A protein has these predicted regions:
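Short amphipathic alpha-helix that is part of the acyltransferase structural core
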Residues: 1-22
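Conserved GNAT acetyl-CoA-binding A-motif
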Residues: 70-83
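Glycine-rich phosphate/pyrophosphate-binding loop shared by adenosine-nucleotide-utilizing enzymes
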Residues: 27-32, 42
Length: 112
């Protein structure tokens, strides 16, 4: 999980240096792709966890770390592309520190 934590920290700390569009990171556990829009919003375009690391709470840890570390200038975290039925159902029931993801026409949004 530490690799995903490092990826998230790197993205958030260097947010202003990235061009708008896709920002992709890979690590030994899988990959995390962000989409940087023109307005202040953290968009997770995709979360891919390698099969051997699934069902170990990695996705939960990623979402919790995003909620805990996203600077206050951002009003929400959005998980945009949900192709997996497992992730879709997980986001519907996810709750952390009284924060939940709500399905919108743009993806799953969590107000910070």
């Amino acid at each position: 999980m530490s690799n995903f934590t490092e990826i998230i920290n790197t993205y958030l700390e260097s947010y202003s240096t990235y061009n708008n569009g896709m920002v992709e990171f890979e690590c030994k556990y899988g990959s995390l792709t962000f989409y940087k829009p023109t307005h202040p919003l953290i968009i997770v375009h995709s979360i891919y966890i390698l099969p051997e690391y699934r069902q170990r709470g990695v996705c939960r840890n990623i979402l919790q770390h995003l909620i805990d570390s996203t600077p206050k200038m951002f009003k929400r975290v959005r998980v945009q592309t949900v192709l997996s039925k497992i992730l879709y159902e997980y986001l519907l029931r996810f709750e952390y520190k009284n924060k939940k993801f709500r399905l919108s026409m743009y993806g799953f949004d969590c107000l910070l």
